[in-house]
Structures are given as C-alpha cells and as structure tokens.
Amino acid sequence: MMAFKLKIVTPDGLIYDGEAEKLIVRTSGGDVCILARHMDYVAPLGMGMAIVEANGKRRTAACIGGMLSVSGGECTLVPTTFEWSDKIDLSRAEASYDRAHKVLNSGSASDTEIALAQARLHRALVRKSVVSFK
C-alpha cells in the first residue's frame, strides 16, 4: 500500500511525523479514512478513536477535537488531545467516567455542570474504548 506524509501536532507538541499508509479519524461529519493521494480536504475533528497504520503496524489513539487537513498529498492532524492507547491510564479514565456519571445522576447539577459532565463522560468512554480495542 502506498504511503503518505502524516504529521500529528497537539498543543503539547509533535506526536508523530512520518509516513503512514492509512489514517482513520472521527470528524464532526463522521469517520473518514485518509489514504495516499487523497484529495485536498479540511474537516473539524470530533471525539473518537484514531487509527494509524504505518509500516504494516496499526496503532490506535483517543483523538479529541481539533482539525484535519490534507493538502498536496500530506496530512496534518491538529487535535486538541491525542493519546496513544498504550499511554492511556485506564483507571484514570474509569474514575473520570464515574465522577461524570455521579454528576449526571445527582439531580442537582446546573446546566453548565451537566454539559461539562457529559463531555467528560464522552472523553472517558472514548479512552476506555481505545484501550479495549483489539
């Protein structure tokens, strides 16, 4: 399979800079698969799993927010948060899920607290699903 240049940059710095055969990410419009020679494309990222296939190996990550750009045969992913599955602390994700669930079930949370808890819950679910993905 042909490769393309992929760069993943977060506010914390450069995560990946190299060749890839395939990138699958969740955009605000749904999942998209980028392969070599993809047409120029820009999309806001949603919250979900990213799959990077490079050198015949597949790596998964939690990819949350940001932008995806494909231009001139090169792909740049600029997520707000990007965590490789082997770097995700499952117990921390489960604790975050439990805290968010508690707020949502309290019956006394404000609209703002509910919105924040829903976002926290979704992020925790993404992290948990990435870790358990086979």
Model region roles, listed by residue range:
Residues W84-K134:
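Acidic/glycine-rich phosphate/pyrophosphate-binding loops and surrounding catalytic core
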